[in-house]
Amino acid sequence: MAKTLNSRIPEGPVAEKWTNYKAHQRLVNPKNKLKLDVIVVGTGLAGASAAASLGEMGFNILNFCIQDSPRRAHSIAAQGGINAAKNYQNDGDSVYRLFYDTVKGGDYRAREANVYRLAEVSNDIIDQCVAQGVPFAREYGGMLANRSFGGAQVSRTFYAKGQTGQQLLLGAYSSLSCLLYTSDAADD
């Protein structure tokens, strides 16, 4: 008999699932954060970003690389860019439009609650990447440049000149190394 994976997506309307879930979650006392060790397996874009974010929140992070070098992550192959609903060009972009385009682009096979949550936090992800030093392409006025990509209704793809994946990994690694040096200095 095959086992079914339980994705544990919260109940309720799609637009409110994760908001309601976060509102009813138990919080970790700030004093207890240093007592918790969080194990992150993988140093690709997801693993490195998760480790950097959790480290910035004050958790002890144990990050394991399953390859011979962290820089061998396949995330380095991503070139197109990242979609976010920032509405820079005043073209009516919204979280719902990004959600719809993403679900449609995935042939309606994606978990809608997770895609909606990703659309909600897409602006924060771009802002975090900029704070980590990712050199996104910019317009002459200094605003982040974006383009239409992959059949989207509006221009919402933020990119780093054909090496978006590599630059995102370098940004995440630089955040990790800052945390590493800070914790090493605190241990001395």
Predicted regions and their residues:
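Terminal amphipathic helices with adjacent charged low-complexity linkers/tails
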Residues: 138-161, 165
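Conserved small/polar residues in nucleotide/adenosyl-binding loops
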Residues: 181-186
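Glycine-rich active-site loop/strand segments that organize a redox cofactor
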Residues: 84-117
